[in-house]
Amino acid sequence: TDQAATAFAAGKVDAVGAFPPFTGTAMKRPGARVIASSKEYPGAIPDLLAVSGDLISERPDDVQKIVKTWWDVREFMEKNPRKSEKIMAKRAGIPTREYKQYKGGTRFFSLEENLEAFSDGFGMKHMPYAAKQMADFMVKVGFIPEKPDMSKLFDSSFVKNIS
């Protein structure tokens, strides 16, 4: 994404799909403007933690520790927002003030929202539904030849163990 944003900023390509912090690079191009963002499509572009099925079957305790660590980090972020912003900005390689610009477009799910996201239902807030919609679209436009088996794609047990 960094190379694509840099190419766009240099005028080598006409459009780019980017996410923070690379949107900052893209927006340095004179006349650049955002034509669509994830703000207009809530729930359609989630960030998530994915691990292999092998890791789950071979080291489930370690996977559980990773998930617990995420919730420990979330608690730290809530209790230490300024320090968290500095840490995340440094990790992204951008000034804290620039990181703050992106913060409004970032939403972290609560534990309850995570559980709901794993559940069956209709609408993009339900990951099984969203995955089906995306797979159908990718088949329709020829990006993939057929819809993959998604029966074992989501495992809510690690999040449920936190609650």
Predicted regions and their residues:
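Pocket-lining segment of extracytoplasmic ligand-binding domains
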Residues: D2-T96
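Residue-level "edge-of-site" marker
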Residues: P21, E40, Y102, S151-K152
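Residue-level detector of family-conserved "landmark" positions at structurally sensitive sites
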Residues: S37, E98-Y99, P148-D149
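A glycine-rich, aromatic-flanked flexible loop/lid motif
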Residues: S38-I45, G104-R107, S156
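Residue-level signal for threonine
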Residues: S52, S110, D155
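Secondary-structure end/capping motifs
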Residues: S57-F143
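Conserved C-terminal helix/tail region of periplasmic/extracytoplasmic solute-binding proteins
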Residues: A131-S163
